């Protein structure tokens, strides 16, 4: 059994990790930490876990964490970097669901996150945890940077075209919508029901932290530096990300050729489902599942629109982290992740 721990177990991502790890056939969950809730039972905070989790929160203890096989950090940026070097030295594998290791350049990280990177000595070995494109590297890694939720949806939607040089790099637009859970569990006036219900609003239009992450990974996949316009929106729903992705083709392609490109690229991927050409995937179809639904459109010759939807807490966070763990420990990639999406 894989001995696992979670640092930061009171947020939505942390409890989603709990929900998925507790029934995992190859995992023993040993520790879940929270300084604020230390000593309190986990199921007192999350009644959906009653009868499934007997653990209590503890303060982070390096002596305990250092004995584990893998530690998940479901923490804000700036936390994992302080613990990573010591845990790695003790042979612990790390999966960081925060942003500390997603950007390979420490200066770029400082620019977007407003703090100096405090573990530059291990930043260079972090592997970006998108299994559909970095599967082999993930299997050999010690430190996994779990992708952000928006980047997961955008990269999976655009990468097949960019990997083949089929899009004009200066025409890329990502218009994305997210549920409120993507903003975390902390109390914020702008996220309470009277502020979000019956309303849609854009944010981060001048520059969102996920943009450099998306650009870095797509540049790596395409083999050429590229930029895109990324605009996120907050939607009056709890879960889900819907990415509408635009680009102009570098050469003419038929609808059938576009569909075949995506269908072939993702044919063997257990968690990417390419729908029939011209389909309209909905976020409600992936709620609670580690799945990305993709549909391709060509509304006029040369103009491509890709629709990509995920559950931000599962394929956009906890589910993908477990997918990465499965790769790290040579398990079936879909182990513990075959939940069917909830409907309605």
Swiss-Prot record:
Catalytic activity: N-acetyl-L-glutamate 5-semialdehyde + phosphate + NADP(+) = N-acetyl-L-glutamyl 5-phosphate + NADPH + H(+)
InterPro entries: AGPR_AS, AGPR_type-1, NAD(P)-bd_dom_sf, NAGSA_dehydrogenase, Semialdehyde_DH_NAD-bd
Keyword flag Oxidoreductase: yes
GO process terms (BP): L-arginine biosynthetic process
Gene3D superfamilies linked to this entry: Dihydrodipicolinate Reductase, domain 2, NAD(P)-binding Rossmann-like Domain
GO molecular function: N-acetyl-gamma-glutamyl-phosphate reductase activity; NAD binding; NADP+ binding
SMART domains (UniProt xref): Semialdhyde_dh (SM00859)
Name this polypeptide is given: N-acetyl-gamma-glutamyl-phosphate reductase
Native source organism of the sequence: Acidithiobacillus ferrooxidans (strain ATCC 23270 / DSM 14882 / CIP 104768 / NCIMB 8455)
Gene name per UniProt: argC
